[in-house]
């Protein structure tokens, strides 16, 4: 299990309240997932922190939506986070949510394909398959790794991606679901 300081838990509770308040207006998360919010969203995002050895990094979260996992990781201690989100309404929410964290959070309201930025780690949650993630982030310089929570189709996604890309991939077990994995992908190179 993940050891989380009391102060972080308090901030995550504030974030949960904010998501649930805004969800009525802009549909940040599915109504079905509100009953199991802590496990489904908070813990599922928070578990990524165990794969971030140095918190003094710049992390990019693409398709940030409701702030999972980017805001959660910032609250948990990641020093600098950029959230890339095309939907202006969600960016307004993210601006409010960013104030909960003591760390630096930048909100970028534009399409991922048009974003040129450098980071240590790139993450996203419930965004797309590996090929799409790699294709749309070609202008983002990822220095260390992609850190990606994936569901039961992770093996077929890896197989498909290897047709177009060379990469190293560590597969870790998710703590929120037996079917889910956390992929650590590095040394990405396009082959076709």
From Swiss-Prot:
Instruction: Name the SUPFAM superfamilies for this protein.
Output: S-adenosyl-L-methionine-dependent methyltransferases (SSF53335)
Q: What is this protein called?
A: Ribosomal RNA small subunit methyltransferase G
* The protein's Enzyme Commission number: 2.1.1.170
UniProt family annotation: Belongs to the methyltransferase superfamily. RNA methyltransferase RsmG family.
Identify which top EC class this enzyme belongs to. transferase
Question: What residues bind S-adenosyl-L-methionine, as annotated?
Answer: 63, 68, 112-113, 125
Among Pfam families, the record links this protein to: GidB (PF02527)
Which taxonomic lineage does the organism of this UniProt entry have? Bacteria, Pseudomonadati, Pseudomonadota, Alphaproteobacteria, Rickettsiales
Keyword terms, alphabetized: Cytoplasm, Methyltransferase, rRNA processing, S-adenosyl-L-methionine, Transferase
* Record localization: Cytoplasm
Its biological purpose is as follows: Specifically methylates the N7 position of guanine in position 527 of 16S rRNA.
| Catalysed reaction equations from the record | guanosine(527) in 16S rRNA + S-adenosyl-L-methionine = N(7)-methylguanosine(527) in 16S rRNA + S-adenosyl-L-homocysteine
What organism, scientifically named, is this protein from?
Rickettsia bellii (strain OSU 85-389)
């Amino acid at each position: 299990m993940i050891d989380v300081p009391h102060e972080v838990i308090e901030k995550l509770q504030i974030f949960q309240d904010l998501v649930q308040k805004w969800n009525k207006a802009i549909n940040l998360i599915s109504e079905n997932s509100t009953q199991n919010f802590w496990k489904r969203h908070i813990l599922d995002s928070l578990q990524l922190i165990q794969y971030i050895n140095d918190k003094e990094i710049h992390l990019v979260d693409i398709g940030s939506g409701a702030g999972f996992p980017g805001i959660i990781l910032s609250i948990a201690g990641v020093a600098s986070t950029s959230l890339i989100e095309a939907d202006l309404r969600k960016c307004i929410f993210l601006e409010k949510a960013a104030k909960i964290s003591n760390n630096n959070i930048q909100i970028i309201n534009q399409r991922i394909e048009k974003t040129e930025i450098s980071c240590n780690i790139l993450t996203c949650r419930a965004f797309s398959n590996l090929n799409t993630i790699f294709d749309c982030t070609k202008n983002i310089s990822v220095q260390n790794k992609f850190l990606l929570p994936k569901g039961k189709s992770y093996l077929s996604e890896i197989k498909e991606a290897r047709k177009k890309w060379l990469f190293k991939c560590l597969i870790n077990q998710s703590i929120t679901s037996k079917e889910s994995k956390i992929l650590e992908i590095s040394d990405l190179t396009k082959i076709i």
